């Protein structure tokens, strides 16, 4: 198990380094020159299917809807989204790999695909089994509490309260051991000398509802995914897992400022196609998804989800 954890951390660190690589380009700048591209042999002649390995209410569901809208607006090609949550993405990945590799099926996935393979080499290897169309979101994580919480109001008081609960405190998180969220929470609890129960939710909406309804004491999530709760004043962040304070969260301390000496792992989300899809169809799909990233509708979506803090585009 220790070897698996080491392999998994190495994989996540590599992926994070790739996703966070510095870019001289401006976030949101369009880097696809071609405004149009001829369809190869008439492809696609019908709607595409996008398999989304998570529920519609979470970050993956939101970005899948936004990208599908942008691709359709650009090309006129409809995209049917097929949500298959479960196993932190493994259910959807299995379904996708069993679908025809004809270019009509595309996949939304996140960094969990890399960690799943790192933990179990029999799982699909994203670097070998998939072709990336576009990475369209790169973001950091935070820990949230209810805005009207009175037992603690900031990170130091939260840590003090958790330590006094003798392991009974709870935080809502994703369900899969070995995911980026679970790895970071282990780093945080070890560094802060906390024992906290991680309550598992594979879908975003129940996870957010658990904090809103008081079933858990805190929430681990990315800011864009809970934007509506932040805007409504329901949630507030008390810790940012990033090396510096983003301007939009300038009043929230980072894990580094709270004495934690680990490199933050970032969440990334993107779109893929099977490696065996016809090459000319892959080229068209790459153009369609990368150019769709430039569409006003998608840029407005990313801006609304704090995805302009880090340059989110990777081809």
Where are the regions that the model predicts?
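A ligand-binding cleft/hinge motif common to bilobed small-molecule-binding domains
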Residues: 111-122, 186-191, 217-252, 297-299
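Hinge/capping helix and adjacent helix->loop/strand transition within the periplasmic-binding protein
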Residues: 36-38, 73, 95-104, 117-206, ...
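Surface-exposed aromatic
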Residues: 303-315
